[in-house]
Amino acid sequence: SPALDDERNDNFIRL
């Protein structure tokens, strides 16, 4: 899961 630490996917995994 590259989206876990990807700042570009901020609206995806970050709470």
From Swiss-Prot:
Coiled coil: none annotated. This is Extended FMRFamide-12. Belongs to the FARP (FMRF amide related peptide) family. GO terms for cellular component: extracellular region. The keyword Secreted applies. It is found in: Secreted. FMRFamides and FMRFamide-like peptides are neuropeptides.
